[in-house]
Amino acid sequence: MMKKFKLIALLLCVAAITAKAQKQCWTINPETNAIEMILSDETIPYSDHIEMSGEMVSFVTRWNIDEQKNFTQERSLVFPMLRTIPNNTHASLMYRMQTDIVSLLGVNGLAPVQLGTKKVSINGALRVVSQYGIGVVNTGAARKRAPSPVVEITYTGFPSTTLPMMCETYEVKNITGRTITVIVPEFVQKAKTDPEKGVDGSYIIQAEIYGNGTFKIEPGKSIEFGAAFQAYREKNEKALTPDVKAEYAKRMAYVKNSIDGSLVLETPEKVIDTEFRFAKIRASESIYRTKGGLMHGPGGESYYAAIWANDQSEYVNPLFPFMGYQIGNESSLNCYKHFARFMND
């Protein structure tokens, strides 16, 4: 009995020490219900990841903020309807891209240098506000001059609701007292997969910038452009040209109508309410339009476009009718129909 008591006491001490050592890295915006990162010396460096999905795509963004508060990311793209060999339940095309879109820009003829992250928030999309600077012509003593702040760039990453692509928007704001020139270049990056490893032969994974051009931006003003990361079959398909701004509007409409429009949890604890809201987003977005109909998949770079037994039938399917979520209801009914084909009489 005494040994048991000592063990319990030890576990309680460890739990107390662990709780004390944990840092609060996020706060809840009471007006938008977004979660916002606390950027301080106590919370950085920081690394994290988040998965978001649409009917034809899923992606995991692995992102990091280093000691200088600079943001970097790696995109792990998943295309559940582009099947690989062996064509089993895990046979989704997957590809990682670390393309740094901002590094491709020209600001007054110079490459922008990141000077730190000002804000990180999540609310149906990952939004990062960072400051960038430029130096001067690299001659003589100018080599030693630190870059001067020139632009503030707001990055927003999110999935298309219906297309096989991850979308990104970039807002470039002039934070100087003079007019600057920003060049958004034409840019296409393609990768072709091994035809022997694809059910439909080779697949093309493509990154592209939309809204390129040369822009003069007055003080306090901004411009916007977009980028998308997509995949398609080489044999009989072509790259899509999305309206990235419209895709963002569709994503936010889904959050507003399907998530915030029904089954809203209200308790004395805002953290619990927010956890439930984000759980609704993840549960309801992760539904894929397969050849066999709409199917829910837990994700995690492993579980897509298939029947995952109790994950669907027991855990998530009963939620959708309470949400009034039609796509979820359709995927639930489809799941049970597939189950019925294998049930005993």
Q: What spans do the regions from the language model cover?
A:
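Bacterial Sec-dependent N-terminal signal peptides
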Residues: 1-23
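Substrate-binding groove/exosite segments of carbohydrate-active enzymes
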Residues: 256-345
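Terminal accessory carbohydrate-recognition/targeting modules of carbohydrate-active enzymes
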Residues: 21-274, 324-328
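Short amphipathic alpha-helical "recognition" segments used for binding
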Residues: 7-10, 172, 315
